[in-house]
Amino acid sequence: METIDKIKQQINENPILLYMKGSPKFPSCGFSARAVEAIIQCQVPFGYVDILTNPDIRSELPKFANWPTFPQLWVEGELIGGCDIILEMFQKGELHTLLKETATKHG
């Protein structure tokens, strides 16, 4: 399977998906750690892809998404953004609302 097809499949199969460095329990960078903590606090199920163990995705996703950095949060097939946007949405209560609505819809 081509890397782009793999990315599309991951995004389609996971209504809430975080591309990050490391895993939710063991994030490998500060940005991923802060982003995943905000998502965990929303108490919804979400998928993740560790880009450190998937170098093909690490190199192709920024081109596909037109977003150069990680982490990247995808919700219902749309890129929401990286760490700064995730944290800003979390502080405003918008992240919780978006993720709860998405989880309920796909629950």
Curated annotation (Swiss-Prot):
Family matches, as Pfam families: Glutaredoxin
Amino-acid positions noted as binding glutathione in the UniProt annotation, renumbered to this chain: 21, 58, 70, 83-84
InterPro entries: Glutaredoxin, GRX_PICOT-like, Monothiol_GRX, Monothiol_GRX-rel, Thioredoxin-like_sf
Gene3D superfamilies recorded: Glutaredoxin (3.40.30.10)
SUPFAM superfamilies hit by this protein: Thioredoxin-like
Domain annotation Glutaredoxin: ranges: 4-106
Localisation per UniProt entry: Cytoplasm
Positions that bind [2Fe-2S] cluster: 29
GO MF terms, alphabetically ordered: 2 iron, 2 sulfur cluster binding; disulfide oxidoreductase activity; metal ion binding
Any single Gene Ontology cellular-component annotation: cytoplasm
PANTHER family: GLUTAREDOXIN FAMILY MEMBER, MONOTHIOL GLUTAREDOXIN-S14, CHLOROPLASTIC
Function: Monothiol glutaredoxin involved in the biogenesis of iron-sulfur clusters.
Family to which the UniProt record says this protein belongs: Belongs to the glutaredoxin family. Monothiol subfamily.
Annotated protein name in UniProt: Glutaredoxin 4
Lineage: Bacteria, Pseudomonadati, Pseudomonadota, Gammaproteobacteria, Pasteurellales
